[in-house]
Amino acid sequence: MASAEVVSKLEAAFAKLQNASDCHSLLKKYLTKEVFDQLKGKQTKMGATLMDVIQSGVENLDSGIGVYAPDAESYTLFAALFDPIIEDYHKGFKPSDKQPPKDFGDLNTFIDVDPDKKYVISTRVRCGRSLEGYPFNPCLKKQQYEEMESRVKGQLESMSGELRGKYYPLTGMTKETQKQLIDDHFLFKEGDRFLQAAHACKFWPTGRGIYHNDAKTFLVWVNEEDHLRIISMQKGGNLKEVFGRLVTAVGVIEEKVKFSRDDRLGFLTFCPTNLGTTIRASVHIKLPKLGADRKKLEEVAAKYNLQVRGTAGEHSDSPDGVYDISNKRRLGLSEYEAVKEMQDGILELIKAEESAR
């Protein structure tokens, strides 16, 4: 049971949400009085309450989603709130739906989407993983951050071949190393206001670090937003190489580290937007002609469930005709399907760019 103190904080938080007429988050949309009363007294075995779930969305009324999961159990204990949010965000993934088993598929069906190097500047595929038996950021203790780091570091440093590289802990990092990692665009900073409010930055920088291979085409973020963010990337459009590298790396890490997976929601992550495959496959691509007609660009992208952003992030424009284009769907389909849909869509966009006037 949540303590009386937590429940009274929750009552105040609920009132604040109700009075915020300019708040349009999914949290506000689905945290009805009925759902609130049903959940306000609950607490997970690891000590998480509804307050941990909603605090970021209450503090940041301009949130799009507004909720995070403090631990794996939260997705089931607070399902009355999470389920409708997940269904809304993941376009109809109903409480009765299930994430298919993990399936990376036949890597030989992937190709270099731009062999002439005319359009695609770079390609990147990432996934998130949580370690089984540990809560997510808001409920982690300092010692747990250190434990997770040491388990993962050992496994990463045993990698061989093209994955071989070095682990750089954020704690005690020298200025030179810091500068190099910033120049490579590898260094992550302490979380933004949404993550701060969700208490995702506790004991910073304890237990946080970055691993990258010598060729700088493979990267792992340890204890940033998720326990692990595993990233494969390179210049050009060779999706087969990029995805293949990610699949190999996940397999190596999995030999020693058990990941948190739910039968219905797939791989569990701190933010419900990343659930399921957790995969974001993206390219930076030059589409000057198509970009001049944004409506047409969005139309082709939507047909393949692709998200179009400027390269500076979510809400940025693209004055130079370069876009960050990625798969929108992560939940309710296999890893293979998510990446294949992105490949098909990119090929179609290149075709449309070539035929644009």
UniProtKB/Swiss-Prot annotation:
PROSITE patterns, alphabetized: PHOSPHAGEN_KINASE, PHOSPHAGEN_KINASE_C, PHOSPHAGEN_KINASE_N
Cross-referenced InterPro entries: ATP-guanido_PTrfase, ATP-guanido_PTrfase_AS, ATP-guanido_PTrfase_cat, ATP-guanido_PTrfase_N, ATP-guanido_PTrfase_N_sf, Gln_synth/guanido_kin_cat_dom
Catalytic activity: L-arginine + ATP = N(omega)-phospho-L-arginine + ADP + H(+)
Sequence positions that bind ATP: 122-126, 185, 229, 280-284, 309-314
Keyword DNA-binding: no
Gene Ontology cellular-component annotations: extracellular space
Record's signal peptide: none
Residues the record lists as binding substrate: G64, I65, G66, V67, Y68, E225, C271, E314
Record protein name field: Arginine kinase
Source organism of the structure: Trypanosoma cruzi
Classification lineage: Eukaryota, Discoba, Euglenozoa, Kinetoplastea, Metakinetoplastina
